[in-house]
Amino acid sequence: RVISGGPLYISDGLGKTDPEKLWPVIFNDGTIIRCQDVGRPTLDCLTAGNVMKEKPLKIYNKYGDHIYVAAFLDRSSLKAVKDEILLKDLPGTENGKEWYVYDHKKKAVDKYDGFTYEIKPGEANLYQLIPATGKFTMVGLINKYISNGAAEEKRVGDDICIWEMKADGDFRFIAEEDGVKVTSSTGKVNLIREGKLCTVKNVKAGEVLVCRK
């Protein structure tokens, strides 16, 4: 439903909804964070045979200039399948930009140079393709499926970026260089860096982060 860009339906019985499964798709006030277009199959899935059994079904959609790809493999599939995400199968990527791929399940990022993944029967994987914006590139709030929909870029420059949070959670961005400094409108910053991936823990809706080199 999240990748479709459409409404979100809940069919649980009264009192049986698990809130932890809803928070990744909503803002603090209950508004749905959804993609801005209609979910469509990637071009390779249009002509492939036995999709969902021998090849994952991949659906893509957009939020801003980020592209989200969800991959699905039917439970009746006999084994795990290896597949790839190619820019040529994603209309809108023919601009010569550099891209990152963020794996929402592994919480890991790679610079796009062709992307291969493995999916098991019954699994659904979510990948976020992010155009590089220089020294700093926003991923967004990683506790939300549509991560960049939960944070707003107020300013993007070579040596400074300003982001405003639209929900609570953990904010993540990519830094190509060392020596990154982050300040917050709250005065408190819990910054964790793992390689190029930087995470500011426990941000709040309305909080503004300023990142400088």
Residue ranges and their predicted role:
Residues 1-136:
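Active-site-proximal substrate-binding groove within the catalytic cores of carbohydrate-active enzymes
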Residues 45-48, 67-71, 105-213:
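Non-catalytic C-terminal accessory domains or segments of carbohydrate-active enzymes
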